[in-house]
Amino acid sequence: MTAPFLQVEGLSKRFGDHQAVADLSFTLARGAMLALLGPSGSGKTTTLRMLAGFEQLDAGRILVEGRDVTPLGPAARRFGMVFQHYALFPHLSVFENVAFGLSKDADRASRVAEVLRLVDLAGFESRSIGQLSGGQQQRVALARALAPEPRLLFLDEPLSNLDPSLRERTRAELRAALKQIGITTILVTHEQEEAFALGDLVAVLKDGRLQQLGTPTELYEHPQNQFVATFVGRASALPGTITAPGRVRVGDVDWPTAGSATGAVTTVVRPEDVVFTDSGLPGTVVERRYLGGRALFRVSTAAGTLEIEAPMASAELEAKVHVTARRSLSFNRDSV
């Protein structure tokens, strides 16, 4: 079995009485992209700073290709970093910004040209930073981080300064460039859509603790607890009872479910998991939101409030409705 490229073991960090990161462990294969996802204060940035060597660990160790790099400073670790606000030098040209961390030898110009081609900025060498758009500045920051050929790349909220219309296109460009280079990458974000678009794996953090690590599909389809279910995508959490293998009772009706727990559970219902029907769990539409070709409904039931995404053709239905599951639902084992 191939050894992991990056091995993180038991990272912990406390600031006074606040436990910022607690016993965090994971592994990452060479060339993989990991997104650290969580709300503000979940420990994402502290984790990134510990990995980069900017923050001292209280406990744990970091191994790269089997070598313990924990005692090394940031420069000796040979990791690259793209900061949230890019930290570009406005008085320097694009070339000078990208070349800033390179030794002044004969290969300097060719290396700058190479990384600018990778980020689709060939020919921009003489431009000033002020002449660039936000997306172009982000790519200059990426080129500068890649120029010294780091072993590992860190991205701290890399797209947060871009407007929504530019962000989606830049995500695709960023992922394509990093996959072409084949560099192992860890990024921090608080946006689920960004984590799913960029990460091969996503680590969900809350209060400094790892809640779940998996592919975007695994996190969305099989959340391990209620926090992950409701933080990753839209979801309604309703009390339920497992009545038989593969069946969960929500309100007065039985719905299909995945898993083998028994007794009281919290049932996780995605907006696309349920549909309007002629019979099933009765409810009342309390809110409608239009989403272009589809609509999002909030339906009050005896078991709790559900969100349902349905075609616009459903928008004219009466307030009194019935809903039923269209596929197996997820649940966690926390007793309600």
Where are these regions (language model features)?
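Helix-to-loop junction immediately C-terminal to a conserved catalytic motif
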Residues: A52
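Non-catalytic connector elements of ABC transporters
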Residues: A235, G246-V336
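Conserved ABC transporter NBD signature motif
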Residues: G60-D68
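Conserved coupling/switch loops of ABC nucleotide-binding domains, chiefly the family-specific signature
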Residues: D58-R61, D207
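The feature captures the beta-strand-to-loop junction immediately N-terminal to the Walker
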Residues: L37-P39
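ABC ATPase nucleotide-binding domains
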Residues: A76-G80, Q84, L88-F227
